[in-house]
Amino acid sequence: MASFPPSLVFTVRRKEPTLVLPSKPTPRELKQLSDIDDQEGLRFQVPVIMFYKRKLSMEGEDPVKVIREALAEALAFYYPFAGRLIEGPNRKLMVDCTSEGVLFIEADADIELNQLIGDTIDPGTYLDELLHDVPGSEGILGCPLLLIQVTRFRCGGWAFAIRLNHTMSDTLGLVQFLTTIAEFTRGAEGAPSVPPVWQREFLAARQPPFIPFHHHEYEQVIDTTPDDNKKSMTHKSFFFGPKEIRAIRSHLPLHHRSTSSTFDVLTACLWRCRTCALVLDPKKTVRISCAASGRGKHDLHVPRGYYGNVSAFPATVLRAGMISTSPLEYAMEGVKKAKAKMTGEYLRSVADLMVTKGRPLYTVVGNYIVSDMTRVGLDTIDFGWGKPVYGGPARAFPLISFYGRFKDNKGEDGIVVLICLPEAAMETFQEELKKMIGEHVDGPFDYNPIKVVSKL
């Protein structure tokens, strides 16, 4: 079992936040979001983070200055990001392209990168220091659509953290924007290699609406969850390398061990452990919702350069008791069934549902949403310092776990999973995970959190 760094105390000094504006004048206009974008379940802020090592060829270059200038250039093309969201009739979201800019924070931390990243990574532990929540910036309406903090470490390494208003883009759309920034940091001139495309009407509801699918992920369920499961939430991350995945596969019948994807195997394991940890009524129905992109689907021709949301969260419904007591294969079949639902037609059905049912929130009770970010490209963004040592999700949410790619100190590639659970449930979750994996699992057991002292 890998260990985290010992308890550390470090200070982060931040300058006052500033607004970065597009580098040249941009159109003043209103742009409607799609009926996928403005659904209730995407009206939140999602953070991601990248860490970069010192690079000798970049000595003398300040990542803060480099990023700030390239960001302004990129915003000239992605100018809606510099605007603010407003609501129209029936709460329809649209961007008021005001060119007010995005929030940018310059910071320095008296710590070295290798003290934060070792055999595994737990970005949620220190995210509040590397991505300061500027008071008044966290809203959906009338607030900056992006918040960026660049933090220099004393070793010459640095961190790039960004918070995205999820209604504007999915992760692939964000990566497209970050790639444009990266191109400008490396000296590109003119337009981005992939010009941005708005065209949010592409995923507007059809007339008349047509909903041929049963969308379990949006069913409203009465909450009977014990109060203990609604408070004292804690965040932890877990690393799953080849040994851990093999250990999980060993719980499956032979015919499933070689035919099931890593995502299927890992997600089934996490869903089972989480269900056990929450100590739910065995008769209670629970859901697994797998975030799935419509990009690349044969029946959905997404325009190249489109950076809006193109994802759905198809779900499978099973009994909690069956998941907890049945072999792992049972939960995995539920995961596969949820994934198989995703098509272009399914996504259009979601858009129609949003308009017909008044943008219902995804199911909160008994739902577990999993978003695999290992292949979106966050780990390839090169601002001139090479690829990040980690580029991926920064924090989980109570109902949502994210997967990110990570290579440990031994050079072993694996998956970091970010988990958010009530404190008592987290302890049980770890014990359940040990049963599935034994002592292979790299997690936060016996971990003393890093302590931080923040200063403006």
Swiss-Prot record:
It comes from Actinidia chinensis var. chinensis (Chinese soft-hair kiwi). InterPro entries: CAT-like_dom_sf, Plant_acyltransferase. Its EC number is 2.3.1.-. It holds the Pfam family Transferase. This is Alcohol acyltransferase 1. Keywords: Acyltransferase, Transferase. The keyword tRNA processing does not apply. One of its GO terms (molecular function) is acyltransferase activity. The keyword Hydrolase does not apply. One of its GO terms (biological process) is response to ethylene. Involved in the biosynthesis of volatile esters which confer kiwifruit flavor. Alcohol acyl transferase that can use a wide range of alcohols as substrate to produce esters. The active site is at H166, D382. Belongs to the plant acyltransferase family. It comes from the Eukaryota.
